[in-house]
Amino acid sequence: MNNLTSTKFIFVTGGVVSSLGKGLAAASIGALLQARGFKICLRKLDPYLNIDPGTMSPIQHGEVFVTDDGAETDLDLGHYERFTGVKTTKNDNITTGKVYHNLLSKERKGDYLGQTVQIIPHVTDLINSFILYNTDALDFVICEIGGTVGDIESQPFLESIRQIGYKLSKNNTVFVHLTLVPYISATMELKTKPTQHSVKELSSVGIQPDIILYRSKIPLSQEQRDKIANLCNVSPTNIIPALDVKNIYELPISYHQYNLDTQILKHFNITSPEPNLDKWENILNISHISTKTITIAIIGKYIKLLDAYKSLIEALEHAAIHNKTKLSIHWIDSRSLNNEITNTFDNVHAILIPGGFGDDGVEGKIIAIKYARINNIPFLGICMGMQLAIIEFVRNVIHLEDANSTEFNFYCKNPVIHQLPELQQNLGGSMKLGSHPCYLKVDSKIFSIYKEQVINERRRHRYTVNLQYKDLLESHGLIFTGHSHHNNNDSLAEVIELKNHPWFIGVQFHPEFKSDPFQSHPLFMSFVQASLNYQETKKA
């Protein structure tokens, strides 16, 4: 530890409305403290009753972020990893559903010895245990509480952090509250009333915020800050703007400029050298150097909420930044595509099919894959995207037109994609999850990209390639260049490549979960480079 006598806890709550950026605020705090040499971890407490987000609609919840140890978690854990480089685990995300599941399991086993099981103390004790678990070696633990203050679902979590604040005292805890200060364009005014009411709501459960972050387009005046300070019992120096930014990687620098990390350390009476933000300044400088622009088409069915593809978008942005290229994403609803493609892909330099589930929109994705294959457009298929690339190839090159996945047609005659037998149980928590080693063929494009024979990538899938078709596929030019070991040393297909195509790769794993702004993932780097090469070819 950094000469601290005890671990400090930072609790981040939100008010007024959801989606204000609590996760990014928490990640930024972590990055700033880390830049000062402190050892940190970040945790997320989600108030919904699902055990995890694994079976939730991406259009409602956003993406499911998968950790190395196979936990299906909230997308904010992706922000935590990308901002700090600290790998999250199953112990860093808890839900009300998981709390109740553990509680009822303990009750059935008789662990409560005949007690009447109640929210207080039994539910809150479990939440407290989650927050405090394995924290002794850390300088700071940053806990984000999901939802909005005032939500019924959040009450046990707020009570838990209140209890921890009381037990550990203000010397070891700080409460950071993020609110909205809306700008009314008709009167050209910033309105502080929502913040006042949000703090009042938080105070009603016994939590007095120490720092207020206000989300706004422009900073408040000193007079407005004094007003909030007076009505919310918070020092004016601790009322800090969370300003809108063009690039989320500006946030740590922005928060530092407004003294967020300084005020947190002042609260704890901790002295520390100024943070080393060189890598953040460097990434912003690079991001402003874009000599070219490429357009990548992403064909999916969750495009109504782009958070469903959050890590994928960030991974592409990272690769574009390090290729000194501006990225434009052309979002296409897979259900809108049919065989009468006219000029849909005329100005596109690459095509990407991300992961997904179910048969809705599948045929549109297959049409896009065929277009990429025939027209030599760089193509990347991830998870289902790889599986659909195989189906397209078998149908249109090998001419087994009834080829399909048993996910879409259980009784198809040529099931080139099928379900792993041991996973034919419950829908939730029944997939291949987490980081696994993948073995690459040395004489392959994928090896030339990674420059390693054994890689570790995260997976999230229930279906896999039926290897009975492997020889047939390879004899026609679709090559298997990566595999992983399965039960009893059986193999699972992890990577495919198309011969005689400039750049056509499918991967069963999810590389987007391991990209960060400081070290772009090699697969996305190569994909963006291939897009640039294709752009030059089109110009010639």
Curated annotation (Swiss-Prot):
Locate the region Amidoligase domain. 1-270
Keyword Repeat listed: no
Q: Name one GO molecular function term.
A: identical protein binding
GO cellular-component terms in the record? cytoophidium; cytoplasm
**Catalytic activity, as annotated:** UTP + L-glutamine + ATP + H2O = CTP + L-glutamate + ADP + phosphate + 2 H(+); L-glutamine + H2O = L-glutamate + NH4(+); UTP + NH4(+) + ATP = CTP + ADP + phosphate + 2 H(+)
Q: Does the keyword Transmembrane apply?
A: no
EC numbers for this chain:
6.3.4.2
Could you tell me which pathway this protein works in? Pyrimidine metabolism; CTP biosynthesis via de novo pathway; CTP from UDP: step 2/2
Residues where UTP binds: 18, 191-196, 227
Catalytic residues (UniProt): 383, 510, 512
Output the PROSITE patterns linked to this UniProt entry.
GATASE_TYPE_1
> Which EC class is the enzyme in?
ligase
| Activity control note | Allosterically activated by GTP, when glutamine is the substrate; GTP has no effect on the reaction when ammonia is the substrate. The allosteric effector GTP functions by stabilizing the protein conformation that binds the tetrahedral intermediate(s) formed during glutamine hydrolysis. Inhibited by the product CTP, via allosteric rather than competitive inhibition.
> Which one GO biological process term can you cite for this protein?
'de novo' CTP biosynthetic process
Report the InterPro entries cross-referenced here: Class_I_gatase-like (IPR029062), CTP_synthase (IPR004468), CTP_synthase_N (IPR017456), GATASE (IPR017926), GATase1_CTP_Synthase (IPR033828), P-loop_NTPase (IPR027417)
Q: PANTHER family recorded for this chain?
A: CTP SYNTHASE (PTHR11550), CTP SYNTHASE-RELATED (PTHR11550:SF0)
Protein family according to the UniProt entry: Belongs to the CTP synthase family.
Q: Which HAMAP family match?
A: PyrG
Q: What else is known?
A: CTPSs have evolved a hybrid strategy for distinguishing between UTP and CTP. The overlapping regions of the product feedback inhibitory and substrate sites recognize a common feature in both compounds, the triphosphate moiety. To differentiate isosteric substrate and product pyrimidine rings, an additional pocket far from the expected kinase/ligase catalytic site, specifically recognizes the cytosine and ribose portions of the product inhibitor.
Name of the protein:
CTP synthase
Species the sequence originates in? Ehrlichia ruminantium (strain Welgevonden)
